[in-house]
């Protein structure tokens, strides 16, 4: 998780200069799972492993604990809202807002005297707006409301509630997709730019080759089997694959390719559309399953406040000892994907810029 900097790490304003303007650009804070996906697929896989008295697990006890962990993190995300800021994420942005004021208090005092205003913007993604709301909360509390009402009126408010002070700016802050978070579509130059980037991610041969090299790296195969072997039997793991007679789980209610929609237990899809899974997602290899488990492990670190009571989970146990190296391998894989898709990427391309 994000570690707040100490005041001693702030850089000083150069001699003979004075601060006239400041801007803070931030990604959303710690969040829960973006959708019912990793937990959904591992639930389906675990249901198969639990057949015949947990025959697919190394022991019934290990199987029951694994299932409880997955069910618990699902319940925590249903309670918090899939894709929404976690309690930890809210605290992070409150702290950023507080430190912005503390660092530049003189600037804001002068702004208040001159009748200047603060401009707030959001990509329109709910967790981004929620992050901004918490930033403003921290800023306003630290400044005793000095500029709480001195806000530039947004042309397109992010929402009608706490996000009413945030101007929804998808062109700048959500430029990578043609579909905006609210379901509208980009037009004109913004749409063309998003389409070029999406085409790059989907069809660029250089990008595909680079990512294939990462996927096929022997370290990924080894780490995936090592991780899963703590939980599942070798025979069960050998049954996963695309060959005839092997198993694939799709993110549907029964795990089949054309099964019904798969929604998290206890969720209300009318209020949380992300609580229902994308049927195209699947587990078709050990690596798929291992990466899903790793993704639960890393999101758990962002959900410490939600990891309590009836939905207490522990994914750290699967990445202890020699398996800490497995975690490093999976982290390398995700970092490589971001490097190639989001930049700098490979030499000679310019879409990520």
Task: Cite the ranges covered by each PLM segment.
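Signature for phosphate-centric chemistry
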Residues: 1-117, 123-353
């Amino acid at each position: 998780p994000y570690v707040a900097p100490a005041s001693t790490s702030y850089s000083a304003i150069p001699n003979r200069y004075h601060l006239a303007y400041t801007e803070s650009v931030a990604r959303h804070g710690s969040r829960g799972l973006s959708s019912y996906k990793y937990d959904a697929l591992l639930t389906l896989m675990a249901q198969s492993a639990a057949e015949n008295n947990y025959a697919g697990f190394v022991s019934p006890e290990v199987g029951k604990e694994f299932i409880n962990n997955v069910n618990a993190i699902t319940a925590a995300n249903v309670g918090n809202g899939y894709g929404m800021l976690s309690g930890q994420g809210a605290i992070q942005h409150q702290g950023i807002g507080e430190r912005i004021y503390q660092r530049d208090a003189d600037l804001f005092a002068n702004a208040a005297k001159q009748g200047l205003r603060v401009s707030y913007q959001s990509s329109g993604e709910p967790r981004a707006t929620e992050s901004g709301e918490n930033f403003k909360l921290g800023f306003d509390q630290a400044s005793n409301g000095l500029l709480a009402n001195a806000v530039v009126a947004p042309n397109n408010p992010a929402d009608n509630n706490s996000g009413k002070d945030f101007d929804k700016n998808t062109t700048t802050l959500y430029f990578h997709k043609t579909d905006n978070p609210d379901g509208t579509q980009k037009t004109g130059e913004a749409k063309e730019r998003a389409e070029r980037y999406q085409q790059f991610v989907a069809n660029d041969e250089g990008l595909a080759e680079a990512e294939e090299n990462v996927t096929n790296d022997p370290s990924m195969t080894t780490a995936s089997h090592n991780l899963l072997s703590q939980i599942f039997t070798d025979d069960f793991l050998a049954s996963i694959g695309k060959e005839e007679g092997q198993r694939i789980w799709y993110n549907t209610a029964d795990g089949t390719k054309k099964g019904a929609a798969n929604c998290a237990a206890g969720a209300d899809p009318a209020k949380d559309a992300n609580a229902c899974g994308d049927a195209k997602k699947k587990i078709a290899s050990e690596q798929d399953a291992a990466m899903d488990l790793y993704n639960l492990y890393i999101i758990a670190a962002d959900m410490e406040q939600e990891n309590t009571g009836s939905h207490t989970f522990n994914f750290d146990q699967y990445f202890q000892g020699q398996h800490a190296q497995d975690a490093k391998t999976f982290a390398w894989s995700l970092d490589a994907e971001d490097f190639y898709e989001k930049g700098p990427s490979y030499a000679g391309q310019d879409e990520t810029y």
